[in-house]
């Protein structure tokens, strides 16, 4: 049993940050990579005949598939990494990890430097950064086009 290695030993925030993507700059993923992103979620409701909008803040657990583009940023102002596509595994309330945001909420995130280009995140679907410009692979450009996220859930909450 001394050689037992869990199945997900290659995909956790410590391994991703300090081993797999230690070097800043562009990478191509060799296996699935789990990252976390803070989202704003809204839901249209009606109370006493008055249309209202209900707001929630959530944390999405995303899985970047193998063979995807990923850029490890030099400074983590908006995230540790920037990437072009990911699969949405789940969306949780920011302060309650045991409760998930229901499907009737629309969860979005803006893409920096692209006005009026919010991305919608839905559990069980891929989210893709699609634009005429390519993913910004400059590790120094913190606000470049692409989807930004963090390797750890704790950092994504800030």
Curated annotation (Swiss-Prot):
Q: What highest taxon heads this organism's lineage?
A: Viruses
Family listed: Belongs to the mimivirus L223/L227/L812 family.
Q: What is this protein called?
A: Uncharacterized protein L812
């Amino acid at each position: 049993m001394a050689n037992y290695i869990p199945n997900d030993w290659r995909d956790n925030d410590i391994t991703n940050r300090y081993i797999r993507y230690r070097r800043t700059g562009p990478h191509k993923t060799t296996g699935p990579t789990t990252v976390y992103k803070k989202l704003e979620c809204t839901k249209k409701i009606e109370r006493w005949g008055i249309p209202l909008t209900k707001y929630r803040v959530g944390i999405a657990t995303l899985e970047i598939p193998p063979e995807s583009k990923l850029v490890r940023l030099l400074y983590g102002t908006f995230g540790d990494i920037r990437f072009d596509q990911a699969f949405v595994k789940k969306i949780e309330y920011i302060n309650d990890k045991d409760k998930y945001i229901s499907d009737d909420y629309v969860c979005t995130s803006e893409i920096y430097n692209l006005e009026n280009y919010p991305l919608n995140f839905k559990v069980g679907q891929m989210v893709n950064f699609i634009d005429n410009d390519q993913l910004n692979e400059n590790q120094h450009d913190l606000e470049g086009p692409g989807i930004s996220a963090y390797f750890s859930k704790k950092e994504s909450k800030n």
